[in-house]
From Swiss-Prot:
Zn(2+) binds at residues 645, 647, 669, 730. SUPFAM superfamilies: UROD/MetE-like. NCBIfam families: met_syn_B12ind, PRK05222.1. It comes from the Bacteria. It holds the Pfam family Meth_synt_2. One of its GO terms (molecular function) is 5-methyltetrahydropteroyltriglutamate-homocysteine S-methyltransferase activity. Its EC number is 2.1.1.14. Keywords: Amino-acid biosynthesis, Metal-binding, Methionine biosynthesis, Methyltransferase, Repeat, Transferase, Zinc. It catalyses: 5-methyltetrahydropteroyltri-L-glutamate + L-homocysteine = tetrahydropteroyltri-L-glutamate + L-methionine. This is 5-methyltetrahydropteroyltriglutamate--homocysteine methyltransferase. It comes from Bacillus cereus (strain AH820).
Length: 762
């Protein structure tokens, strides 16, 4: 039996975020197209070279992108909306689809399954000519071969997942469009095979959550492709969960290899293999190293997995690989020497995970004695972090044990609370507000950097933050907003900021991962028990409130979002970590309230993304996610108004969960998803305060008043005006001042027009 090492995908952003910087330099016209393409090629080849040097045998090619791999596939197959037809060059079309332009609305963006990565949603239009517009995987395969002598493994997004992620067609059209994808995929695979590709990875992550009928439909497409390309060696790759429910059918697909996730889908996939075996004529690609977290693998557990598999599987060959693409992990931990030894030793970023694959391969091919020293090191590291004082706090354990049922609910029901809040807050019909953050200008970022580097004092930094806060309080008053925010100028990131002020968190210097486009985030590391230390937002919020007679809302990030946007310890259930965060936030909310803050927003944009892929697992997750929010927010007085915010989700799946949060007001992204949540509300009722975002903040274009008014008008057809709020889709941190002010002025004017119409019709 041959055993090979493989990787499913490598982080794109570069060790020092060179990829991000190159993109942004190109967008701002600081470099030309030739310089852009040259630099991107250098980064791309460097990533291949690193994997080659680490000892990976099957190196992914084509996982690199200028923005998003789903967008790459859409462009490649000709899924280009007609509104972009005036653009002629590849990059102009590509980036217009991703980012929009002054006159063109960008394609929708949403979460990649249950991760914090966003993809550009492919759009189908009637009359679309589906064809292989550009065989990008072939070009990149030949590039790696010619430049580095690497016979790589092309990686493509599979036809079924691609079309399932697309929008713009009816369910009745799906089968027809799916068949139209056969020809371009046949051409793509034929050309790769003819060029010498030994194995081609076809990603089908959606296979973890398909019905029996859908799997059969997918199989027919693969049979049609195989008929035309009989000799190509295809690796059907699944990840993010098991394919247990459809395993028996999936192993009959006409492919040479099947990749399964034995980290996040371990139990289900092992159960399926135990029940149905594995085809002797296929290669099993074993996802055994976690591609979504940053902890060292338990190599003893990994080797036990292979022992189990080798007893049950008479497979042709084995492939040792991560559970999914390493896109979701930082690149290398070597710069994180500021961390404690016990934490540093416990980490494994992308490059370290490649080393773990090679260690596993050595143990499997040469015996465990060949890595005996490494195994002993790993065991010691795991023992040290498990027994750490940071993971065994008695006060945190006691607080969790003391929780009672009444800690998870507000004293009065929503209708009675809202009446009291209206009396206390004296807000107009259709109140306007923003989601929280205002532009983080170059000056803001530079001043924060100088403060962190000790160039300016704490006092100077605080004075600067107060100056920015006052400036934007005045802007908001002049614009005419009803509920103001302080602007969050002191915050780098909505999760990092809180993590820096809570026990149990640690932070990397260079642990960046891609969120969307050039936007990178540096998730906190939750390594110990989480606990409140001191007030985190009191000073800035109270100062902002002192500057105005209008209501200023406190701004917090919710427990589930902090959890889902962090790298989380893996020694206790995520539910328990979420409850720890909720208890810490509960303390902060009580301090805000006692300081005179009457509206407090607790953002949960990541609540939906944490849901398991399989519907059967949803209830358990939603129960503890909702309970976490309630635990954080339920101790305030009835007169205190609790807001929350969500963005980029398939909300129809969680309307009941949103209702169960019992927030007085929820604001939801609406504009970029082209009003999908409005459609959801046509089929269900939502009886609490709600604001459906009226403009897309991820695009630089300033929408007109009429565009926003149209969304307000549509929203009021399904929402009670008494409970309706008007707000942007999301925070305005990444936009420029000259974009924000006119957009908010248009929004306020749209609100005034809507109020006038309601009064006229009353």
């Amino acid at each position: 039996m041959a055993i090979q090492t493989s990787n499913l995908g490598y982080p794109r952003i570069g060790l020092q975020r060179e990829w991000k910087k190159t993109l942004e330099a190109f967008w701002s016209n600081k470099i030309n197209e030739e310089q852009f393409l040259t630099t991107m090629k250098e980064i791309r080849l460097q990533h291949v070279k690193v994997q080659q040097e680490k000892g990976i045998e099957l190196i992914p090619i084509g996982d690199f992108t200028y923005y998003d791999h789903v967008l790459d596939t859409a462009y490649m197959l000709g899924f280009i909306p007609s509104r972009f037809s005036e653009f002629t060059s590849y990059l102009d079309v590509y980036f217009a689809m991703a980012r929009g332009s002054k006159d063109h609305v960008a394609s929708e963006m949403t979460k990649w399954f249950n991760t914090n990565y966003h993809y550009i949603v492919p759009e189908y239009e009637e009359g679309l000519q589906i064809s292989l517009k550009d065989n990008r995987p072939l070009r990149l395969y030949e590039e790696a071969k010619q430049e580095l002598g690497v016979d790589g493994k092309p990686v493509i997004l599979g036809p079924y997942t691609f079309l399932k992620l697309a929008k713009g067609y009816t369910q009745e059209q799906f089968a027809t469009i799916l068949k139209q994808l056969v020809a371009p995929y046949v051409q793509l695979l034929s050309e790769l095979h003819a060029a010498g590709a030994q194995i081609i990875q076809v990603d089908e992550p959606i296979f973890a959550s398909l019905t029996k009928e859908e799997v059969q439909q997918a199989k027919e497409i693969y049979e049609a492709i195989r008929k035309e390309v009989p000799n190509a060696t295809l690796l059907l790759q699944t990840y993010f969960d098991s394919v247990e429910e459809n395993y028996e059918e999936i192993i009959t697909f006409p492919v040479s290899s099947i990749g399964l996730d034995f980290v996040h889908g371990k139990e289900g996939n092992l159960n399926a293999i135990s029940k149905y075996g594995f085809p002797a004529d296929k290669t099993l690609a074993v996802g055994c190293i976690d591609g979504r977290n940053i902890w060292r693998a338990d190599l003893d557990e990994v080797l036990t997995l292979f022992t189990t598999l080798q007893k049950q599987v008479q497979t042709k060959d084995l492939i040792v690989q991560p559970s999914c693409s390493l896109l979701h992990t930082p690149i290398d931990k070597t710069e994180e020497t500021h961390l404690s030894t016990e934490l540093f030793d416990a980490l494994a970023f992308a490059n370290q995970k490649l080393e773990e694959l090679v260690l596993t391969h050595s143990a499997l091919t040469q015996g465990t004695e060949s890595i005996s020293n490494e195994l002993e090191t790993y065991r010691n590291v795991h023992h040290t972090i498990r027994s750490s004082a940071a993971r065994n706090r008695e006060d945190v354990k006691a607080a969790r044990t003391a929780l009672k049922e009444e800690d998870f609910s507000r004293p009065l029901p929503f209708e009675k609370r809202y009446e009291l809040q209206q009396v206390a807050l004296k807000l107009p019909l259709l109140p306007t507000t923003t989601i929280g953050s205002f532009p983080q200008t170059t000056e803001v970022r530079q001043t924060r950097k100088e403060w962190r580097n000790g160039i300016i004092s704490n006092e100077q930094y605080e004075q600067f933050i107060e100056k920015e806060t006052e400036k934007w309080i005045r802007y908001q008053e002049e614009i005419g907003l009803d509920v103001l925010v302080h602007g969050e100028f002191e915050r780098t990131d909505m999760v990092e900021y809180f993590g820096e002020r809570l026990a149990g968190f640690s932070f990397t210097k260079n642990g960046w991962v891609q969120s969307y486009g050039s936007r990178c985030v540096k998730p906190p590391v939750i390594y110990g028990d989480v606990a409140f230390i001191n007030g985190m937002t009191i000073k800035e919020t109270v100062y902002a409130q002192s500057l105005t007679e209008k209501v200023v809302k406190g701004m917090l990030t919710g427990p589930v979002t902090i959890l889902n946007w962090s790298f989380v310890r893996n020694d206790i259930p995520r539910k328990e970590v979420s409850y720890q965060i909720a208890l810490a936030l509960r303390h902060e909310i009580e301090l805000l309230e006692s300081s005179g803050i009457r509206v407090i927003q607790v953002d949960e944009p990541a609540l939906r993304e944490g849901m398991p892929l399989k519907e059967k697992d949803w209830d358990a997750y939603i129960t503890w996610a909702v309970q976490s929010f309630l635990l954080a927010t339920s101790s305030v007085a009835n007169e205190t108004q609790i807001h929350t915010h969500m963005c980029y989700s398939n909300f129809e799946d969680i309307v009941d969960a949103i209702r169960a949060l019992d927030a007085d007001v929820i604001s939801i992204e609406t504009s970029r998803s082209h009003g999908e949540f409005i459609d959801t509300l046509k089929h269900t009722t939502y009886e609490k305060g709600i604001g459906l975002g009226v403009y897309d903040i991820h695009s630089p274009r300033v929408p007109s008043k009429d565009e926003m008014y149209k969304i307000v008008e549509q929203s009021l057809q399904v929402c009670d005006p008494k409970y309706f709020w008007i707000n942007p889709d999301c925070g305005l941190k990444t936009r420029r001042t000259e974009e924000v002010i006119p957009a908010l002025e248009h929004m306020v004017q749209a609100a005034k027009d809507a109020r006038s119409l309601l009064k006229t019709n009353a």
